[in-house]
Amino acid sequence: MTTNVGSPAVGIAVKAEQNVLADRFKTAVKDCDVERKENLSGYRQKWVQWMSWYGYGAPEPNNIQDQIHRMLFNDLTYRATASVRSSVEAGMEISARSATLVYLLDQGYVVSQVLALQKLLDNGSDVISVKRLLKNVEKHRPFITREVYVAGDGLPYDFTSWADTVDKSDPMVQFYGIDAPGLRRFAMSKQLHETFDQLSGKKPDQRTRQDVIPKSIFRTLDSWISGPRFEEIKDLRDKVIAHAANALEVGKSTFNGVSFSQIDELQRAIVRVVHALIDEILSIRITRPVVPIAPLGIFRGLDLLYSPSDAEAKMHQRWDDLSEERNGWNAGVLQEVTFSPTSP
């Protein structure tokens, strides 16, 4: 995922490891080229809050970026691990096709994905979710005016004023114009204006400082993560978790109504809505991947024998021991529930 909204030469995006909050609002509100200072103050407060929900700024263990990373990490790890079931020739006996391992892996995968998707789409007002972020940004969209979007962190509002700040006889200026070295602030301003043109539906000759993003943009984003296909997630959550033993069709790409293509579609919609909000509407300006980098050696050891042949009997014995313990949990229930030394 990238936040570069224009020419790569301008470098409007920074690397993900850089602190997005460190320098973003280094310029005081009073020194910004913004007419409505109180509006900018309100925007900055909300922007910091929105970024903490997303995963930058104040620590939030359930932030949206971490939720998405966990969801995608689990998804890719499962699919890559399970792929050997079909990639290895059918005649070769491998533990990857063991009915028990297949059942446990498949069940864990489906449950983790359904829960992750449902959590990101939770519409509650007390959770950190994509739905809540979308609703909150829309609610406060009057803060996001063109002048705040372009000049709210110290950039010039009028990018055409660059010509008054340079030596026009400079060969670099004559060749590159606004993209010449030393004019980065003006080039960024120009790009942000162009992006806001798209968001606001305005042409360059219609620009005003108080342009805002229309509600239709937010309605479109909401439609991407709403409707019957997303309502099904709630039903799937209940069905898969409450009746997990019957939810799996071993070795198939469908789990009683949950398909890989369906999961792909829901994941993609969530990722794209988050990109629209964080990268375009809130202009985070950070380049980062959608999927976290895989740890070194993530699949190391999967080529080893799962257990020696004589371990099967020990597994059966362990099952029997655990069963005996749990079957004894009902013993003495009546005596314990009816005995209370503190009863009158």
Located regions from the model:
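Amphipathic alpha-helical interface segments
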Residues: 2-228, 255-344
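Histidine-centered, metal-coordinating catalytic motifs and their short helical/loop contexts
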Residues: 223-250
